[in-house]
């Protein structure tokens, strides 16, 4: 689940991994993903939680196409920047974990959607106030063509608001949803993202 420590960059690897095993019992129960900030890879595995920051030698083709479609680099490492705030709500990230030494850096870089939750087991934990539970439902849809016309940097915002259907699927299933009005495809700001998360 880990890797061999390297003398300078990984000197605290064992400590972080064993602390994560303790933190596993102190995290709130529930089905959610976690995110990490400037700590070692794959901490989520020790927590039995899916984690946005991940290193693995295999990845499903759908993941390798999903992330780049949102303007996020994805190869064997998943490491979306904090500036991709809408990705956290879209992928149901409820908690972010960092070390006390990195707290100030995180708070300076993060958007307003994070609140300090607690410190325990050598970690500082933040709660995503824009958390959207897994399995949320949609009221709106847009077509694949409309989706692809949107700037990559705002597509995660759009996916919080509407489901993407191929033209063929829209002809069959579009009757169950409302076609997203053109004006709502352009209001893709942080404030509108917060409202969209509340509506989910």
Regions from the language model: what does each represent?
Residues 1-54, 126:
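Extracytoplasmic
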Residues 87, 92, 98-200:
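Flexible, solvent-exposed extracytoplasmic
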Residues 15-26, 79-84, 101-104, 111-112:
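Short alpha-helical segments and helix-capping/turn motifs at coil-helix boundaries
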Residues 23-26, 66-69, 153:
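Residues that form generic nucleotide/phosphate-binding pockets
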Residues 41, 59, 103:
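Positions that flank functional sites
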Residues 13-17, 27, 80-81, 89-90, ...:
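Active-site-proximal structural scaffolding
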């Amino acid at each position: 689940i880990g890797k061999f420590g390297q003398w300078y960059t990984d000197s605290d690897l064992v400590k972080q991994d064993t602390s994560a095993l303790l933190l596993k019992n102190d995290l709130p129960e529930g089905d959610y993903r976690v995110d990490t900030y400037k700590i070692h890879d794959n901490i989520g595995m020790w927590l039995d939680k899916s984690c946005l920051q991940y290193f693995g030698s295999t990845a499903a083709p759908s993941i390798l196409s999903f992330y780049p479609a949102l303007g996020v680099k994805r190869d064997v490492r998943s490491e979306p920047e904090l500036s991709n705030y809408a990705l956290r709500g879209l992928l149901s990230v409820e908690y972010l974990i960092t070390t006390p030494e990195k707290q100030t850096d995180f708070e300076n870089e993060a958007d307003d959607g994070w609140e300090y939750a607690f410190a325990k087991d050598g970690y500082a934990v933040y709660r995503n106030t824009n958390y959207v539970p897994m399995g949320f439902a949609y009221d709106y849809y847009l077509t694949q063509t409309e989706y692809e016309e949107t700037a990559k940097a705002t597509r995660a915002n759009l996916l919080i608001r509407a489901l993407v259907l191929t033209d063929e699927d829209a002809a069959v299933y579009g009757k169950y949803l409302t076609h997203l009005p053109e004006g709502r495809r352009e209001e893709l700001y942080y404030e509108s993202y917060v409202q969209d998360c509340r509506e989910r």
